[in-house]
Amino acid sequence: TLVNYLGGGDDAAGMARVNKFCQDHGYTSTSMGRLLLADNSKGDNYTSAKDCGKFLKTIYQIDKGTATDNNDTLAGAEYMYRLLKMQTRKNKIPAQMPSEVKVANKTGELDHVENDAGIIYDTAKGIDLVVCFMSQDLNDTAAAQNTIAQDSRAIYGYYNE
């Protein structure tokens, strides 16, 4: 896994490196306490829409060459942006966008959870956007997916129509 790679073959060292990066870059609502889907008796993983949005904004600005803060350096930002553009799950943020609008996003799904964070780009008026949706304790995940799609479309429309 990426965490194992970051830790030089040691998952705990990789998680520590992720947490240090988050602390050093002001992602104050993000922490990695365990590997994905591992028993959470030793810790939990959490983040916020604000931290996800900030991270995506940094990736976008570095890719566009518009980063203004000297702290806005992130090795591999351009590669991360390319990976986000390759997302195959289109049932949330991109679902109701006009066909010419592009979305680079990362979804997250668990039982009773539907998340999506993305960059809406190549828009009608050139106003690119970062949006992030996070949910938990859902009874109807299909309704949540539809709400994310509707809200994304409404946000796009507000700025670009």
Label every PLM stretch briefly.
Residues 1-62:
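Mid-domain, small-residue-enriched loop/turn segments at the edges of structured enzyme/sensor domains
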Residues 7, 57-92, 96-161:
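Structured C-terminal helix/loop/strand segments within mature extracytoplasmic catalytic/sensor domains
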